[in-house]
Amino acid sequence: MELQLAIDLLNKEDAAELANKVKDYVDIVEIGTPIIYNEGLPAVKHMADNISNVKVLADMKIMDAADYEVSQAIKFGADVITILGVAEDASIKAAIEEAHKNNKQLLVDMIAVQDLEKRAKELDEMGADYIAVHTGYDLQAEGQSPLESLRTVKSVIKNSKVAVAGGIKPDTIKEIVAESPDLVIVGGGIANADDPVEAAKQCRAAIEGK
């Protein structure tokens, strides 16, 4: 089981500084969509240039022109790139092909997908590296959690890894870990903690069953 830190609300310098503080406890560091909107792909490059021994994910949330956008993210140092599960099949296939051609990985974000079971099966057959169930900020505010979605997707896929995101914190991560996802994505639960290093350490301990 892997742990990913999602960083959404910092500038690229502070993001790299935070990532380096917790890198002993995480496998993947994400440059979140808001940072990419604010600072562009150079934010991904800054992270890639300033951290070692962890993968860098660019949360592009691609919808179209997929092979080009994947190639650009890779050029700027991304190891994992995200595309939306609601994108066209042709876009997702092109994104997977471009990522794999460069020995990189593609994560498909299932945010706003209505028929999770059907879409997860299709994405699994297409060769997505990760399929991520994601309760976004707006639904978290309504009290929703990704647990049920995680169970649904995990029950139908054969080859892809299952990732889970959405309001996960050190004090709630154990119920997520109990469902055995392949990748647990924690954002504010680490980034906004009073002590991010301690929060990351607790999350790592949870996924290692300690």
Curated annotation (Swiss-Prot):
Pfam families: OMPdecase (PF00215). Signal peptide: none annotated. It catalyses: D-ribulose 5-phosphate + formaldehyde = D-arabino-hex-3-ulose 6-phosphate. It comes from the Bacteria. Pathway: One-carbon metabolism; formaldehyde assimilation via RuMP pathway; D-fructose 6-phosphate from D-ribulose 5-phosphate and formaldehyde: step 1/2. One of its GO terms (molecular function) is hexulose-6-phosphate synthase activity. SMART domains: OMPdecase. Keywords: Carbohydrate metabolism, Lyase, One-carbon metabolism. GO terms for biological process: 'de novo' pyrimidine nucleobase biosynthetic process; formaldehyde assimilation via ribulose monophosphate cycle; L-ascorbic acid catabolic process; one-carbon metabolic process. Its EC number is 4.1.2.43. The keyword Disulfide bond does not apply. Belongs to the HPS/KGPDC family. HPS subfamily. This is 3-hexulose-6-phosphate synthase. It comes from Staphylococcus aureus (strain MSSA476).
